């Protein structure tokens, strides 16, 4: 059962204040992720401690980097159940995990960060991994290689 909205609102805002679009319905997820064009980050938010202490701060750090995905999205596990399930269907080859981060390029998951890759790590270390993935898959050089 989802937590009361007033409890999770600050956790949602910790992500959306960095330009990440929240997807709360199946229709929103399909409209955003479904076309599969360009690069998109999908952050699966969570109420857990490793989201608060690692994943959300790491996301903020990584998004301050010059190179980042064209589209930034988030769903909230345990809150927006249908939207989260639909988002996870786009990266079904990966075990459901929250928090987690999927980096999608042209409809294909090219990088995935599971919860176990977040737990016990500093936000800086997690962000460094995300930035490396951004450089590899989202840079102008990466785009030129796809053409």
Where are the regions a protein language model picked out?
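N-terminal leader/targeting and pre-domain segments
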Residues: 1-38, 138-142
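Short acidic DE-rich linear segments
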Residues: 144-147
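Short active-site neighborhood of thiol/selenol oxidoreductases, capturing the structured segment around
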Residues: 36-48
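Short, charge-rich binding segments
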Residues: 64-66, 91-95, 102
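Non-catalytic, surface beta->alpha helical segment in thiol-disulfide oxidoreductase systems
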Residues: 95-142
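Typically the conserved alpha-helix immediately C-terminal to a functionally engaged Cys/Sec
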Residues: 52-65
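Thiol-based oxidoreductase modules, predominantly thioredoxin-like and allied folds used
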Residues: 23, 44, 67-86
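Short acidic (Asp/Glu) patches
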Residues: 81-98
């Amino acid at each position: 059962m989802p937590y009361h909205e007033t409890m999770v609102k600050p956790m949602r805002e910790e992500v959306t204040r960095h330009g990440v679009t929240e997807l709360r319905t199946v229709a929103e997820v399909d409209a955003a992720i479904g076309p599969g064009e360009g690069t998109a980050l999908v952050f699966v938010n969570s109420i857990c401690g490793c989201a608060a202490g690692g994943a959300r701060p790491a996301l903020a750090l990584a998004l301050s980097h010059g190179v980042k995905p064209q589209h930034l999205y988030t769903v909230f596990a345990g809150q927006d159940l249908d939207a989260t399930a639909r988002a996870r269907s786009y990266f079904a080859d990966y075990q459901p995990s929250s928090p987690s981060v999927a980096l999608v390029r042209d409809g294909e998951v090219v990088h995935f960060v599971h919860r176990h890759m977040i737990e016990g790590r500093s936000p800086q270390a997690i962000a460094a991994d995300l930035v490396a993935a951004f450089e590899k898959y989202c840079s102008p050089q990466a785009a030129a290689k796809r053409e």
